[in-house]
Regions:
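Acidic, polar ligand-binding/catalytic clefts
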Residues: 67, 78-146, 286-299
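A ligand-binding cleft/hinge motif common to bilobed small-molecule-binding domains
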Residues: 93, 107-118, 162-170, 188-226, ...
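Extracytoplasmic small-molecule ligand-binding "clamshell" domains
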Residues: 23-105, 255
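Bilobed "Venus flytrap"/periplasmic-binding protein-like clamshell domains
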Residues: 39-48, 58-75, 111, 129-183, ...
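Short helix-initiation/N-cap motifs at beta->coil->alpha
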Residues: 25-26, 79-96, 139, 177-189, ...
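Periplasmic-binding protein-like
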Residues: 44, 127-138, 202, 210-249, ...
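Ligand-binding clefts/hinges and TM-proximal coupling segments of bilobed small-molecule sensing domains
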Residues: 23, 33, 159-178, 216-218, ...
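Extended ligand-binding regions for polar small-molecule ligands
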Residues: 23, 29, 67-72, 145, ...
Length: 301
């Protein structure tokens, strides 16, 4: 059972979103009403978005947002009880599991882009990051050009690995590109010398470095390969459910509730090691809060 968010936050969101929720039930809303269950897809090591803590509970910034959505849906569907099923997903399985109906919401660190919107839908952007690479300081890898001829790792099924494959072809870098399944695995490859660099979203790299045995040994590139807006995934062509989810997100921003949730995960100590990531809210995300968008176009951010 998940920990409830503060009642003041829940009340603001539910009251604000209530007028638009659950009218003619179809698609996912009907499924939730009929089964009394909502299935949330989660990651295992996407700190601080969706991951296992030291008690083997799934926690994180994206999970808190998904629980807000779950609480609002439960209230508006007037369900005495709404069972939450947690289904693990990886970078490779998350889109298929949304598309085939196994998972209702994917609560993680997934980039919303125009290509993915052909398969799934996204709610309002909840974080904006950039694609960079992490390496050992001793290797002196500062730019993409410095990676020439090296073995690098990224995650299968991500925009990150697609981008580095494209850059490798464009620049003729002669990279040996390995595909890991999870973030912790990618970091371990650099830590143990199997790869010279790990290409991934910078916020995830900062989290991995901060939680490592020797954070002072690693550096994250100044070079940014792209802008990556994160969104909670849901099925395409399900306008009633998307309307519900979007309204919850919009009200979370409008009410200011997002500030407490953001601070909890990015500006305060987080489990399992009590590390403070100390990542202030970016100008790009503040812009989203002021003018909520679900755009998959990086230029919007």
């Amino acid at each position: 059972m998940h920990l409830k968010l503060p009642l003041s936050i829940l009340a603001a969101v539910i009251l604000g979103a209530g007028s638009t929720l659950a009218q003619d039930l179809t698609g996912t809303l009907k499924k939730i009403k009929d089964t009394g269950t909502i299935t949330l897809g989660h990651r295992e090591t996407s700190v601080p978005f969706s991951y296992y803590d030291d008690k083997q509970q799934i926690v994180g910034y994206a999970m808190d947002l998904c629980y807000l959505i779950e609480d609002a849906v439960k209230s508006e569907l007037k369900l005495p009880k709404l069972e939450v099923k947690l289904n693990p997903v990886t970078s490779a399985t998350r889109i298929p599991l949304i598309a085939n109906g196994t998972v209702d919401l994917e609560c993680g660190s997934t980039t919303n882009n125009l290509e993915r919107q052909k398969q799934v839908s996204f709610t309002i952007t909840h974080f904006v990051t950039s694609n960079r690479f992490m390496s050992k300081k001793a290797a002196h890898l500062n730019t993409v050009e410095d990676l020439r001829g090296k073995t690098i790792v990224s995650l299968s099924g991500t925009t990150n690995i697609k981008q580095i494959i494209e850059i490798n072809a464009q620049k003729g870098l002669n990279l040996n590109i390995l595909a890991a399944k999870e973030h912790a695995e990618g970091f371990l490859m650099v830590e143990t010398g199997r790869a010279a660099a790990f290409v991934m979203d910078d916020i995830l790299l900062y989290s991995l470095v901060a939680g490592s045995k020797s954070p002072q040994d690693y550096v994250i590139s100044a070079d940014a390969l792209s802008v990556e807006p994160y969104g909670i995934m849901l099925r395409r062509d399900d306008a009633p459910f998307k309307k519900v989810v979007d309204q919850v997100m919009i009200e979370t921003y409008r009410s200011g509730a997002i500030n407490a949730i953001y601070d909890k995960w990015f500006l305060k100590p987080i489990p399992p090691k009590g590390i403070n990531l100390n990542v202030p809210m970016s100008a790009a995300f503040k812009k989203v809060i002021a003018s909520p968008t679900d755009s998959g176009d990086p230029a919007v951010y």
